[in-house]
């Protein structure tokens, strides 16, 4: 299986599950490959044939983007190290949840939650602690007796009941056989990969500008200007846009560049993503712009930005330009 085949499979699964999808991100490097939304569920999906290809920098950006946009970041792949990903198993890479296409299908199409998570040392299952304790006490069985039957310590059984420790698959099967009840706790993928309340505030690690203030790049100066309008600005390194700008009432995918053919290409992609993320999309042009907008992405010249005094005025400017374009 190639990565291209994998991407098409993922898109097919999400579409079948009822998700609306953005255009594919065709830039390099990229922190995510496609954005998808179904009702209040927003996914930023990174596709990697080998999930170990995810690095810490990309994972960090995925988490911050998802947090700013009120969504969840996931990785979908086919293998890890020298073996294929197991179905119905979830993996973690730098606090980003990773899974196979089949697990994605089971969860979003069939509504079947996985039961097993991979961790150093093997595969583990979370136990329904209340059910275990109820089953044990109903049979008047002591912690010590159950521990001896399963081959673990009394403290371990206590931890299982408190849901403070996962168990191996063999232990869970043994416990279920003893009591005749299902004890494995299904994994909620959205919660596990950090499904957050919309517009929750993120706290990215902000890098200090290199050199003296006067040596800031033009793009950084423009982002500073947007920040002074009242926006919380999250710079990006691997997204189709330069930053996400956010205040209490709006979120803006923000591009910054001189006008060129690449800007038009990125503006198209930003427009598609903004429709899925339900945000505004703006490209600040450092110099003259030959266009006023590209689909839903509004192009604003730097000199026009300099005449705007606050975030509401910027939003009004964006809406006015959109209306003019649609007319």
From Swiss-Prot:
Organism superkingdom: Archaea
Region described as Disordered: spans on this chain: 195-214
Ranges of residues in domain HTH cro/C1-type: 132-190
CDD domains per record: HTH_XRE
DNA-binding region: 143-162
Basic and acidic residues bias (residue ranges): 201-211
Molecular function, one GO term: DNA binding
Coiled-coil features, chain-numbered ranges: none
Keywords: DNA-binding, Transcription, Transcription regulation
SUPFAM superfamilies in the record: lambda repressor-like DNA-binding domains (SSF47413)
HAMAP family tied to this protein: HTH_type_cro_C1
Protein name (Swiss-Prot/TrEMBL): Putative HTH-type transcriptional regulatory protein MM_0444
Record organism: Methanosarcina mazei (strain ATCC BAA-159 / DSM 3647 / Goe1 / Go1 / JCM 11833 / OCM 88) (Methanosarcina frisia)
